[in-house]
Amino acid sequence: LFIAAATYLATGLASGLFYREFTKLNGFPEGTATQLGFVHTHLLALGTLVMLIVMALEKTMALSADRRFTWFFWTYNAGVALTAAMMTWHGILTVLGRPSSAAIAGVAGLGHMLVTAGFVLLFLALGSAVRRHSAVETADTTA
């Protein structure tokens, strides 16, 4: 989880730098909307922050004891990576003044579906961990 959070931090910061330099290099008007400008925030929020929160939950509730946690990790991260990649590609096309295709939107939609499925798996694992944790606390107070 730490490596995933650190990787998202590095790629999030790099994507912000890429956005600034790529738009400047190509004479793209400042303040004009492009998806390229949002990749930075998506990677930092959906990547770094979520992984840090999950890391804290893992430490306190042992989420990885549930087999769905592994499914969450890989599904969610595949979704974030796919979404960020499609946003980057779409943003590059916008800056270069080239049209985007429906395929890019479709693949980005698939990325969003994977993120959603990942969140569902996380909440299923979290619910199981909360019940396990609650049962242990109840057993401790009755003993």
Regions found by a protein language model. Give the residues of each.
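Hydrophobic alpha-helical transmembrane segments of multi-pass integral membrane proteins
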Residues: 1-143
